[in-house]
Amino acid sequence: MIATLPDEAYAIVEGRHADPFRYLGPHRENERTVVRAFLPEAASVEAVDEKGGTAALERIHDAGLFAGLLPNGSARYQLRARFGDTIVDLEDPYRFPPILTDFDLYLLGEGSHQRLYDKLGAHLMTLDGVEGVGFVVLAPNARRVSVVGDFNFWDSRRHPMRVRGSGYWELFIPRATAGDHYKFEIVSAQGHLLPLKSDPMAFAAEMRPSTASIVLDPERVPHPRPAPAGISALTSPMSIYEVHLGSWRRKDNNDWLSYRELAEQLPAYVRDLGFTHVEFLPINEHPFDGSWGYQPTGLFAPTSRFGTPEDFAALVDACHAHGLGVLLDWVPGHFPDDPHGLAHFDGTSLYEHANPLQGRHNDWGTLIYNYGRTEVVNFLVSNALFWLERYAVDGLRVDAVASMLYLDYSRPAGGWIPNKYGGRENLEAIDFLRRFNTEVFAKFPNATTAAEESTAWPQVSQPVEFGGLGFGYKWNMGWMHDTLNYISMDPIYRKYHHGQILFGLHYAFSENFILPLSHDEVVHGKRSILGRMPGDHWQRFANLRAYYAFMFAHPGKKLMFMGCEFGQDREWNHDSSLDWHLLEQESHRGVQSVVRDLNNLYRTMPALYELDCDSFGFEWIVTDDGDRNVFAWIRKGNAARARCLVIANFSPNVYYDYQVRVPFPGKWREVFNSDSAHYGGSNVGNIGEVEAVGLVPELSLTIPPLAVIFLTPED
């Protein structure tokens, strides 16, 4: 070993150099080209130029640091290293030009780079005629970052990265390739070695409990065909089937179905039932099955539980081929504190708030994104755009928006920090959500977004330019709570809660609402939807059929969690399949038939969807018959005679000669009756049609028990 080495040499061998390119690789010194290479375990190293000339490099440090003059002064060369009896020709990663351009660094610095996924992460590329992988990661407060993986024996000494701009570390590793596993080893500014970190921008990841990122070849991921145009528009029917991919169906040994096996079964099933969209619970990579995907660590990687990114693309394509829109649950509100993830990423609170009063979610034990950081907002917005572009999904449902909007969300007095005006509104989160929606609709005008927002925050689905948050839709949590509470009561008590059905129409058009019967309503001791229904066996199923019909006749788009469509009796369990054997029973088949027929009516009857989000599309007819638990209303479409009369009877009694005024004289046809024998009902009804007579046209109807009927005017 040469005794008079510069400090930079020791920084290299000790793994603490922030810019190894300043010392390693080729350098012009005294009009000669000197090359230095750090190859631990190498017995000897030669430099071989493009003409075949060779020059032995001298070992200048016993740890494996070599240096020497390049033959012929060439800047293009390889390293020929001997490891025991093996001789290997290597490309020197420290001779290649930068990955990020100055313009990239400028955009990254100001937070306006809208395609982070094109620059950060691991990308196959060719530099100076050599194939390899370029790695880029944000770690502005790190002292040193190294790439470790299959290509370097997971030895952090071999591939330290260089830092550029405002904390972006990069390195091109020749001959690394698709399928290689990798992580980042980070040393904090204080010199502490952190747990190995997965790539925040990884496009593929290992199956839990392993946590390595995987280099992906994007050419192998086919771009799914688009969904039908306008499928998510306010004036289009929108009926969403919400699915947890790991428990929709399972194999006989309780193993998951793969993405491709799901592609063969799920889209056809959903389309047969008449739904227009399928919504997947979060498919981002996540370490804990019991989080259902809502605690992701790999926001850019489809979970490897069910296959590869190529397989997930095939599932999206199959849904589109069946005419279904694809929505993803998206979680920009919080993330888990697993040591391989985003938490304390570079030794500091890079993605989260440092103060736990702002940065930790007490209910879920997760960390909250710091929306005041440009890099964090850019990361999240880019992630949203990534799924819409790369996998052609048709929209994103944003989870737990209320927890983002309020600084005091689920916090005791004194357990939160007010904003700069002394209020509880999270101003940075508001700005983030507005930017997210603005960017999504600017680049993907046919896509949509939906907010799970459980408070009365105003203008959630109003445009940003009018002061709103800019979402396409908002989940109507108030409707869900009120109506489930009402329908769960014994009919004898419902007259005292008549207002729970009426109240929703006071605000039904203040937002573009989705009516959600989601996964959250069939877990944690709440029972299944069927499990909430009162009465004996027949009454429970009649109540359920009536409730679903009421939902489809109510203004707002529809969402139903898997299993609800056939009356799953037990709560949802993410560790097992739905109870498909229940379809052997007539009562459960009847519920499934009701859902199929309601979907088909909803999709084909403009009165039920065209003005879902417009008060002109709804008119109460009967609101004051609480003693008999009866309601009636008209749904309207744009055409003059696009009308649907809805009668809901939430009592177990039959009412004969029930008078209901209607807008048109003549015949009205009964197009749906949830009490039909076809569904398992008592088959009470109006024998197909009724004549409206009188100066003010009225129908004299037979109203079946615990049932909802639809009637439309004949042309």
From Swiss-Prot:
InterPro entries, A to Z: A-amylase/branching_C, Branching_enzy, GlgB, GlgB_N, GlgB_N_E_set_prok, Glyco_hydro_13_cat_dom, Glyco_hydro_13_N, Glyco_hydro_b
A Pfam cross-reference name: Alpha-amylase_C
Catalytic residue positions: 399, 452
Biological or metabolic pathway of the protein: Glycan biosynthesis; glycogen biosynthesis
EC number: 2.4.1.18
Biological process per Gene Ontology, one example term: glycogen biosynthetic process
Keywords per UniProt: Carbohydrate metabolism, Glycogen biosynthesis, Glycogen metabolism, Glycosyltransferase, Transferase
Keyword Transferase applies: yes
First-level EC class: transferase
Catalysed reactions listed for this entry: Transfers a segment of a (1->4)-alpha-D-glucan chain to a primary hydroxy group in a similar glucan chain
Recorded GO CC terms: cytosol
Superkingdom of origin: Bacteria
SUPFAM superfamilies hit by this protein: (Trans)glycosidases (SSF51445), E set domains (SSF81296), Glycosyl hydrolase domain (SSF51011)
Gene3D superfamilies: Glycosidases, Golgi alpha-mannosidase II, Immunoglobulins
GO molecular function terms listed in the Swiss-Prot or TrEMBL record: 1,4-alpha-glucan branching enzyme activity; cation binding; hydrolase activity, hydrolyzing O-glycosyl compounds
Xref: SMART domains: Aamy
NCBIfam families per UniProt: branching_enzym (TIGR01515), PRK05402.1 (NF003811), PRK12313.1 (NF008967)
Function: Catalyzes the formation of the alpha-1,6-glucosidic linkages in glycogen by scission of a 1,4-alpha-linked oligosaccharide from growing alpha-1,4-glucan chains and the subsequent attachment of the oligosaccharide to the alpha-1,6 position.
Family: Belongs to the glycosyl hydrolase 13 family. GlgB subfamily.
Subunit structure: Monomer.
Protein name: 1,4-alpha-glucan branching enzyme GlgB
Encoding gene (name): glgB
